[in-house]
Amino acid sequence: MPSAVLIVASTRVHVDAPEILRIQDTIAALLKEGCAVDVLVPRLSPLFTASLPTGARVFTAPHIPFCGDLPARPSLRRLLAAFVLFLRCYSLVSRRAYDVLHGFDDGVLVVRALDRVTVRTYPYVAEIHRPLSSPGFFKGPRSALARSLERGALRHAAAIILPDEATLARFGGKIPKARVSIIPDPHADFAPESFTYGEFATAIRHVYDYVLRPRRPEA
C-alpha cells in the first residue's frame, strides 16, 4: 500500500451526495491501511465535513464566483473549475511526495494533466461514476472534447474503478478493460448488489497493490 495518497474530487462534489459518501468510504479504507490521505475539493459542504474520517487532510481550490452551481453536462465553466483544481493540485504535489493520485469523475482529467506536466510520473487511479458520455448530455464540440479527454485519461490510468457493469458498457470498449475493477458502494445493508464494507476495503487495497506492483524493466 502507498504511504501517501492525494484524492482529487470532481468539480461538482459539493452537490453530489453519492460521490461524497464514496470518497469518505475510500478515505476510511486507505486510513485503515495506514496511508496518509489528502483530499482536494473545489469547496467544502456540510455533508462532506460532517462525516469526514479523522486523519484525512482536506484542501480547497480558490473560489470562482461564477463557477458555484456547475451543470452536470460538460461546459466551459466546468473546464475552468477543473483548471483551478489543477493549479491547486500542482501546488500540493510540489510540497509533498505522494505515491498515488486518485481522481473522481472529472477529477481524473486533473490528475492526468498533472501527470503530463510534472517531471515525476505519478501513477493514478481513475474512478468514474458519471461518465461524460452519460445519456442526456448535449451533443456538440464541448461534449466531444470532454469525452475524448476522459477516454485519454482512462487509457493512461494505472487502474480504473467503476461502480457497475452498466457504467463500463457506456464506454463501448474504448478503455483498457484489463485495468478495470468493478467496485460497488459498501452499503450492502441498503442495496443487495452492493459490497459490505469489508469487501469494499479489500477491493480498494487490491487496486492499490496492483498500481504499485513491481514492474519488469523493459528489455
Each predicted region: which residue ranges?
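N-terminal strand-loop element at the rim of the active site
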Residues: 9-14, 29, 33-77, 166-172, ...
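Nucleotide-sugar donor phosphate/pyrophosphate-binding loop at the beta->alpha transition
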Residues: 18, 122-123, 132-152
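Membrane-proximal helix-turn-helix segments that form the acceptor-binding/catalytic region
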Residues: 25-28, 87-94, 109, 117, ...
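An aromatic- and histidine-rich active-site surface loop
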Residues: 45-47, 78-86, 90, 100-121, ...
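A short, active-site helix/loop in glycosyltransferases that binds the activated sugar's phosphate group
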Residues: 112, 135, 155-179, 187-189
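A charged, aromatic-enriched C-terminal amphipathic alpha-helix characteristic of glycosyltransferases
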Residues: 189-213
